[in-house]
Regions:
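Hydrophobic faces of well-ordered beta-strands that scaffold small-molecule active sites
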Residues: 56-62, 110-112, 142-146, 176-178, ...
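Mobile, glycine- and charge-enriched loop segments
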Residues: 48, 56, 60, 77-80, ...
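Glycine-rich, proline-tolerant flexible connector loops at the mouths of alpha/beta enzymes
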Residues: 32, 62, 84-85, 113-124, ...
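Conserved short loop/turn motifs at secondary-structure junctions
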Residues: 28-31, 62-64, 116-120, 222-225, ...
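Auxiliary Fe-S-binding modules of radical SAM enzymes
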Residues: 1-38, 104, 235-370
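Conserved, mostly hydrophobic/aromatic
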Residues: 14, 44, 74, 114, ...
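N-terminal pre-triad scaffold of radical SAM enzymes
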Residues: 39-83, 88-115
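Conserved Radical SAM active-site core
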Residues: 81-219, 223-240
């Protein structure tokens, strides 16, 4: 087991400026190799408390999966359907706006997360109409469209991704989710998503968004065909861009769910990676991102509420969102994907922390009363 106490002491002593001379790839590899999850978790939790104390945030959220039509055919995805498949769907603009308005009325959502497949039949006018329709009807932040979806729109329009981003921002786009990153190493992408945008394209589109004043989250999907070197490389690429653009406001590591996917059918991945890998990834992420990205989500959607509670004790500060209508993870049969505000607040309090409702930019809205 690699002794990582010198790395942890550097971080605890604030012995560097992470935007200029922070932890390195070699440091990240040593942390990834270490089996001392408890010690790394203790340090990660202390770093989280330095930033946010005993508060844990969440957001009232609706997920809108607007289409499952996709021509990328990722081997890790159980959600997509090819064009003209009998189970393929695209939600109309009117229906999508109706769902958002209803969720605002019933649950007082602060954000709608809009994601779907790479549908070649949808031009930018669909998204502009959707965003403007939502903004006209209710005060809800639009957190929408991963870089790979942005790239798909640009290809349909024969336009640049920067122009697509600018038009979507004008239509009401507030921030971008970090989906489509998976592992930012093309060797891995060639195995799990050969038709999806390359790693450098994902990073470029994120940088373009940041330069246009559109903040985003970043993600890592681990526990499939990658190794720890790939994980470290992927995390370092996010760190490198953050030092440059300062546009990532949250990081979300989540484990691959193999059920009903091509990776499982081909025997490449049989099981999910388990709870200890989650806690290690959370702890390493907090340590590596300290001073760079303040917010790390506990990713209850793929790991369950109990593991999300443990993640809060290993460096996460955000429980993610209430979810109504999520269909991507649901397609794997992993678990129930509805979680209410009361359930989240209860889960946070059970580990002795204070629940705080936030907006899509991680600004605190209110401390939840006892």
């Amino acid at each position: 087991m690699d002794d990582v106490r010198d790395i942890l002491e550097r971080v605890m002593n604030d012995d560097f400026n992470n935007y200029e001379d922070g932890l390195t790839y070699d440091d990240c590899m040593r942390l990834m190799r270490s089996n001392d999850v408890h010690l790394m978790g203790v340090v990660a939790y202390e770093l989280k408390k330095r930033i946010l104390g005993d508060r844990v945030t969440f957001i009232n959220n609706l997920i809108l999966n607007y289409t499952n039509v996709c021509i990328t055919y990722c081997k890790f995805c159980a959600f997509y359907r090819p064009p003209r498949h009998e189970e393929a769907y695209t939600v109309s603009i009117d229906e999508a706006v109706r769902r958002v308005v209803r969720a605002k009325s019933l649950y007082n959502i602060r954000q709608v997360l809009i994601q779907g497949g790479h549908n070649p039949e949808l031009g930018i006018e669909y998204y502009e109409g959707l965003f403007k329709g939502i903004k006209d009807k209710c005060d809800v932040a639009i957190h929408a469209l991963s870089p790979s979806e942005i790239d798909m729109i640009a290809r349909v329009e024969r336009s640049s991704t920067r122009e697509v981003l600018a038009r979507l921002k004008d239509a009401g786009l507030d921030s971008i989710p970090g989906g489509g990153a998976e592992i930012l190493v093309d060797e891995v992408k060639d195995m799990i998503s050969p038709l999806k945008i390359r790693s450098e394209q994902w990073l470029r589109i994120m940088e373009e968004a940041h330069m246009l004043g559109i903040p985003s989250s970043a993600t890592m999907m681990y526990g499939h065909v990658e190794n720890i070197e790939h994980r470290a490389l992927s995390l370092m690429k996010i760190i490198e861009l953050q030092r440059k653009s300062k546009g990532f406001i949250a990081f979300i590591p989540w484990n691959f769910e193999p059920n009903n996917t091509e990776l499982q059918a081909e025997g490449m991945v049989k099981y999910s990676s388990g709870g200890m890998q989650l806690l290690k990834m959370i702890s390493v992420s907090r340590i590596m991102l300290y001073g760079l990205i303040d917010h790390i989500q506990s990713s209850w959607l793929t790991n369950g509420v109990a593991m999300a509670q443990l993640a809060l004790l290993h460096g996460t500060d955000d429980f993610g969102g209430t979810l109504y209508g999520e269909e991507v993870v649901t397609a794997t049969g992993a678990r129930s994907t509805t979680l209410t505000q009361d359930m989240i607040v209860k889960a946070i309090r059970e580990v002795g922390m204070v629940a705080v409702e936030r907006d899509n930019l991680y600004n605190n809205i209110r401390v939840m009363a006892e």
